[in-house]
Amino acid sequence: MIKRIISIVFLLLTLPQLALAVRIKDIASFDGVRENQLIGYGLVVGLNGTGDSDQTNFPVQSLANVLERMGVTVNRNDITVKNVAAVMVTANLPPFAKQGTRIDTLVSSMGDAKSIAGGTLLMTPLKGADGRVYAVAQGGVLTNSFSYGGQAASAQKNHPTAGRVPNGGLVELELPNVLSDRGQLRLNLHQPDFTTATRIAQAVNERFKGGVAAATDPGAVMMNLPEAYKGRVVEFVADMERLEVRPDAMAKVVLNERTGTIVIGDNVRISTVAVSHGNLTLYIKETPKVSQPAPFSKTGETVVVPRTEIKVNEGGGGLAVVKEGASIGEVVRALNALGVTPRDLIGILQAIKAAGAMQAEVEVI
């Protein structure tokens, strides 16, 4: 089974490596075109006795304030909140979201509520980092979970103290349009790289002619709006984002020792190195032996004699030689000949890197 898995990995790595071109819109985005995080404090009502306990004070204060704003005078000492839970509401405001646009919201309990499933989120203002209200949220909470219990047993599915309000947020304040009336745009790469940024600038200049784009650093490409697209920024962005480039990446090997996962980039190369692999199994068994004197002996005594059994089993090791400039597919094939497991391969790759024979960055997660 292990050899089959490694053979599959080798087959995938030794397939013809084609220069895969991707759209610019998939590897970069314009400066300012991003989501903005919103947050708010609210109440979930209508719970079936699974809300906050009386020991949690802020739900009582919040509920009293809500009732007073509605003209209902209450004594805070008489309020119980078993059917109410104080929650934090979060959401992401998409770029170019217009007034009246619906967005999803996340609801998370703040107190000691057992479950907010089936409750209703009361109208909650959602603020941005600048303190302004950009949306309001309200609606039924969906948790896809439950929590039931008795005196001797309980049952729970998923996480009943956090849920979603699908389309529960309503945008009230729009973000400014960062693309309108701008003669210069900055394109930010999701993964900064000198080569990729240069290729993007070259592709844009070939398509629109002239010095439209220039890579200012590995993470940004500055673009001047062509004269033919004056007043038509959206059309220019649409035409530019459809262009395809071949992104470049630094050679990297990612190892996860907890799960045995290995991810190896296509650009990884190995210098000439010899690899030996062997398995050593040590088996130790203690079997104490009791020695008793002969019957009716007056001088003898019962003693315990230790007896240790040791077995050493060393698997058949081997020596594999990896040639100069070998690709990662060739490395896997050489190591496969030694019969290594994925976890053994992690140790071997780390040893190759320590020997200075791997021209790649090794990241352990």
Swiss-Prot record:
<comment type="subunit">
    <text>The basal body constitutes a major portion of the flagellar organelle and consists of four rings (L,P,S, and M) mounted on a central rod.</text>
</comment>
<dbReference type="GO" id="GO:0009428">
    <property type="term" value="C:bacterial-type flagellum basal body, distal rod, P ring"/>
</dbReference>
<feature type="signal peptide">
    <location>
        <begin position="1"/>
        <end position="21"/>
    </location>
</feature>
<dbReference type="GO" id="GO:0005198">
    <property type="term" value="F:structural molecule activity"/>
</dbReference>
<keyword id="KW-0574">Periplasm</keyword>
<comment type="similarity">
    <text>Belongs to the FlgI family.</text>
</comment>
<dbReference type="Pfam" id="PF02119">
    <property type="entry name" value="FlgI"/>
</dbReference>
<dbReference type="GO" id="GO:0030288">
    <property type="term" value="C:outer membrane-bounded periplasmic space"/>
</dbReference>
<keyword id="KW-0975">Bacterial flagellum</keyword>
<dbReference type="GO" id="GO:0071973">
    <property type="term" value="P:bacterial-type flagellum-dependent cell motility"/>
</dbReference>
<dbReference type="InterPro" id="IPR001782">
    <property type="entry name" value="Flag_FlgI"/>
</dbReference>
<protein>
    <recommendedName>
        <fullName>Flagellar P-ring protein</fullName>
    </recommendedName>
</protein>
<keyword id="KW-0732">Signal</keyword>
<comment type="function">
    <text>Assembles around the rod to form the L-ring and probably protects the motor/basal body from shearing forces during rotation.</text>
</comment>
